[in-house]
């Protein structure tokens, strides 16, 4: 597998064709929808994130989304930032729930746990340690695996600002081995990822620039990773957030019921323990 990217396929025209939408998802493991979320709701969430960065002293008063830049993602208190972003208002807004239910074809439950991201441009560091290596969310989250990850940009993304890359159809091979990758760390702990040797030449990486209002949903066993923000001329912030969604009738595990700040506040735990709620001897 090489880091060359083809575009996501736009699935928006399939939203009203249940059979075609399910067929595409079963084959490719993702659904990319353009402009389906209320842009004003997304903008409000972006403004809340901006105000959080200002309140915590990482951006000057009067900074706008167009002028925002911060020195470091890692310097921001991630738990404190969650007090400023009312993401559940977006995830569970009636207009948003209609989108989720159209994708699933049934009533849904949106996880209480949300991840928020505010990455400044770092063109001299191609892979900052806080980025995630190739992995499957289903390795961490359970016990049921019928959830889908929903990833949205709060500001426009470009090939420079990066985003999330997915390996087309990789979900069909099921769960894969994840090994510790010392060059990727979260909360001071090494993060597990999938060895590159695990991938076949047919598992093409996909990435497309996205606009606020777009959403990418993918399978629990979709192999994916974060791409760095290396934007220049202009350098831009990447602001995004993601959660998981599952059928309302399914079992609800620890990550589904526990807000991220509750699981993240224990500094002694690495990412595996935080997501599962179960202490582990090795992350």
Swiss-Prot record:
Binding residues for Fe cation: 135, 137, 224
Residues engaged in binding 2-oxoglutarate: 135-137, 151, 226, 238
GO molecular-function terms, A-Z: 2-oxoglutarate-dependent dioxygenase activity; iron ion binding; L-ascorbic acid binding
Catalytic reactions on record: 1-deoxypentalenate + 2-oxoglutarate + O2 = 1-deoxy-11beta-hydroxypentalenate + succinate + CO2
Gene3D superfamilies, sorted: q2cbj1_9rhob like domain (2.60.120.620)
Pathway listed: Antibiotic biosynthesis; pentalenolactone biosynthesis
UniProt record, GO biological process: antibiotic biosynthetic process
Known cofactor(s): Fe cation; L-ascorbate
SUPFAM superfamilies: Clavaminate synthase-like
Annotated residues for binding of substrate: 117, 186
Keywords linked to the UniProt accession: Antibiotic biosynthesis, Dioxygenase, Iron, Metal-binding, Oxidoreductase, Vitamin C
The enzyme's E.C. designation: 1.14.11.35
Xref: InterPro entries: DxPntBtaHylase, Phytyl_CoA_dOase-like
Name listed for the protein in its UniProt record: 1-deoxypentalenic acid 11-beta-hydroxylase
Gene expressing this chain: pntH
């Amino acid at each position: 597998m090489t880091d060359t990217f083809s575009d996501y396929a736009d699935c928006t025209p399939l939203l009203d064709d249940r059979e075609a939408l399910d067929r595409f998802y079963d084959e490719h493991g993702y659904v990319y929808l353009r402009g389906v979320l209320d842009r004003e709701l997304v903008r409000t969430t972006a403004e809340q994130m901006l105000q959080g960065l200002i309140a915590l002293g990482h951006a000057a008063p009067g900074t706008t989304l167009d002028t925002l830049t911060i020195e470091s993602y890692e310097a921001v208190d991630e738990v404190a930032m969650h007090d400023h972003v009312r993401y559940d208002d977006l995830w569970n807004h009636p207009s948003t729930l209609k989108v989720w239910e159209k994708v699933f074809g049934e009533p849904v439950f949106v996880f209480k746990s949300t991840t928020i991201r505010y990455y400044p441009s770092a063109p001299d560091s191609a892979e900052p340690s806080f980025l995630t290596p190739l992995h499957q969310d289903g390795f961490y989250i359970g016990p049921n695996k019928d959830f889908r990850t929903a990833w949205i940009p709060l500001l426009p993304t470009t090939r420079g600002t990066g985003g999330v890359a997915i390996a087309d159809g990789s979900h069909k091979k099921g769960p894969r081995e994840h090994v510790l990758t010392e060059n990727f760390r979260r909360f001071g702990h090494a993060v597990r990822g999938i060895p590159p040797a695990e991938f076949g030449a047919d598992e093409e990486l996909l990435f497309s620039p996205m606009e606020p209002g777009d959403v990418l949903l993918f399978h629990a066993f979709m192999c994916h990773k974060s791409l760095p923000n290396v934007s220049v001329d202009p350098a831009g912030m990447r602001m995004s957030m993601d959660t998981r969604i599952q059928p309302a009738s399914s079992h609800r595990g620890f990550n589904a019921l526990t807000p991220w700040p509750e699981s993240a506040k224990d500094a002694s735990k690495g990412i595996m323990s935080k997501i599962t709620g179960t202490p582990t001897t090795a992350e």
